[in-house]
Every structure is written in structure tokens, then in C-alpha cells.
Amino acid sequence: NQKLLILDSENILGTRIRQNRVVSTTVLIPEYASVLIPVFCSEQNRWSSSLSQEDIKVSESLYFSKGRENNFSDIYHSNSKQTNQHERWSEISDKLDEFKTKSFTSSVEEIYKKRKSNIEEIVRNFQPEKNQVGVALGIGSRLVSLDIFSSNEMFKIYLPRLIRSTALDSFKKTYYKS
């Protein structure tokens, strides 16, 4: 009996769903409510679910920061909660190529797995302050993420995910031009 916050760009993974999904917009779900959540597919070539007992789970990372920006832009300019699915698949394909990552299902999660040790090294350098509730993250001189939460406890949950999202894009130095 608590409200549930689902942040935009949360990666929802699992074999029970037909494809891995990314939440398109932040949703605060009231207690005991049933809500349709806008998502896009982050895995292009898997169209079937599995009878496996693996539960649906939330990834340790969010969708990469440049993708978060593009998704937000789609939603803002279309004045809806939906994003352009083909553009999301295209940017995932580009990201797989950029990191020379093979994925039968074209899953963005494979990139995070491939660079996990590099990304976790970056995550370890960020420790939240006692009462900190937000963070501004940049690549070079460009601000790419600004997130504020209602409590330090909530912030501590999301900080590593936000850093992973930004870290993935930081490996390509020309990705964000000043």
C-alpha cells in the first residue's frame, strides 16, 4: 500500500514478455491502482514470450542518455506519451554498431553487459551526499541529465542507473558536441 514511481527510461526485462521494454514517460502509480504504462520495445528481433519461470525484472541501467533525450523530444513534439518505435530501434542498432556488439535480438541490454566493468568503474566514483536528492550529469561541457527526487532514499536507488545511462554515451567523445 504505497505509491510506485516508475522513471522514464526504465528497462523492463524478462522472458515472459515478448520483447524487453523501456518506459516512455515517468509514471507515479497510486496505491492499489491498475495503470497502462507507455513503453517502447528495446529489442527488435524477439517476438515470442517464453514459458520460462524467469520473472519480469527492472534492469540495473536506464536507457542510454542520448536515447532518453530523443525519446523525450518525440513525446514533447508529438504531444502524446508515445515515441517513434522505428527511431528507437534505429538508435539501438547504431549503438550496437558503435560498440561492435552482436545481439541476435538487437537488445540494448547487450551493450551494457559488454561494457559492464568500464561502467561500474565510473559508478563507483559517485557516492551520494547525506541529504542529496538530485544530480546534474554532463559529458564534456554538455548537460545531459538533470534529475531530482523526493527523498535521499529514492535518489540512492536511481543514482547508479542514471550514471550508467550517461556513462554509456560518454565513451564516444564526439556524441555530444558543445
Enumerate the predicted regions with their spans.
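Helix-biased "structured C-terminal domain" signature
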Residues: 131-178
